[in-house]
Amino acid sequence: MSINEVRYLPECGSTNAYMKEHFEEFGPVGAVYTTNQTAGRGRLGRTWVNAEGKALYYTVAIREPLAQPATLPLLASLAVRRQLALRYGVDCQIKWPNDLLLNGKKIVGILCESVCYGYQQQGRGILCGIGINLAQPQSYFDAADLPHGTSLALQGAAIDLEQDPGWLAEALTDFGFDQPLYTFARDGFAPFREKYKAACVNIGRRVTFDLPDGGQGAGEAVDVDEEGRLVVRTDSGEEHVFTGEVSVRGIYGSL
């Protein structure tokens, strides 16, 4: 499974929205990126505030069948983590399911969503949008009311805004997704599970999580299973969490 085309956009509303509109122009797997995204949105409907030229916004679109499409965000977090380590020497942690943290602050957000295409919209695909904070100053996070956000530059990385966005987009395409997708499409999340668990900041910490009935549960996160669910040990037994908000003690100010 190869990425057939990577398209650079000087500006767009949202790379995910662009991919939805142009999905059929790409092959089985395609990608698009920009450093100027004016109308993005985050997980659970949150707005992703634009910082022109100082962040990378990248979306990969897949129409090939995947063994476990719901776990693509977890694979994506590993892909980005590896490329940031190679480029900048940083050791990011993953806050389940797919936020990347550096020194306890969010540096990468990932948003995956399904898309329909083709005759009578019978085709099914998946989009994976990634936002990487490269060089926003602290004033950006203050003005955007993002107290738990940071950028690579704020954490001491040397950022070249002329070269780095293109390099990262190319690296994500060639090594982050292109190679792992062969395995992921066939075998799902299981081959990547141990690497994910080793980087997951939730494991061993107390977490609170949303319940299907609208309530909240709490316990210690002890595992991530082969379906990508966070396993939480509660007073009443184990819960396998796959959707909703999860707060982690000591992260983002959670107690």
Please give the residue ranges for each predicted region.
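N-terminal lobe of the biotin/lipoate ligase/transferase fold
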Residues: 1-90, 106-108, 115-116, 254-255
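Long, positively charged amphipathic alpha-helical accessory segments at protein N-termini or as interdomain linkers
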Residues: 65-67, 74-92, 102-255
